[in-house]
Amino acid sequence: MPQRASIQQTADFLGVSTKTVRRYIADGRLKAVRLGPRLIRVERDSVEALMRPIGK
């Protein structure tokens, strides 16, 4: 996964829908940056943190 991935790439990586990724961004569970009016990129570090088991 690239350092900054598209919403579709992130959804494919996590095995969820793009709607779920957008909800994670809105809830603050994933960090994302807007690079233009329609271009959103998700930070790889936040995806890895989301996948990290609790207590590890």
Swiss-Prot record:
Q: Which InterPro entries does the entry mention?
A: DNA-bd_dom_put_sf (IPR009061), HTH_17 (IPR041657), SinI_DNA-bd (IPR010093)
Keyword check for Metal-binding:
no
In UniProt terms, what function does this protein have?
Excisionase and integrase are necessary for the excision of prophage from the host genome by site-specific recombination at the att site.
Gene Ontology biological-process entries: DNA recombination; provirus excision
Q: What keywords tag this UniProt record?
A: DNA recombination, DNA-binding, Viral genome excision
Q: How is this protein named in the record?
A: Excisionase
Q: Which family does it belong to?
A: Belongs to the L5likevirus excisionase protein family.
Can you name one GO molecular function term for this protein?
A: DNA binding
UniProt-listed Pfam families:
HTH_17
Q: What lineage is this protein's organism placed in? A: Viruses, Duplodnaviria, Heunggongvirae, Uroviricota, Caudoviricetes
Q: What is the name of the gene encoding this protein?
A: XIS
Keyword DNA-binding attached: yes
**Coiled-coil annotation: which residues?**
none
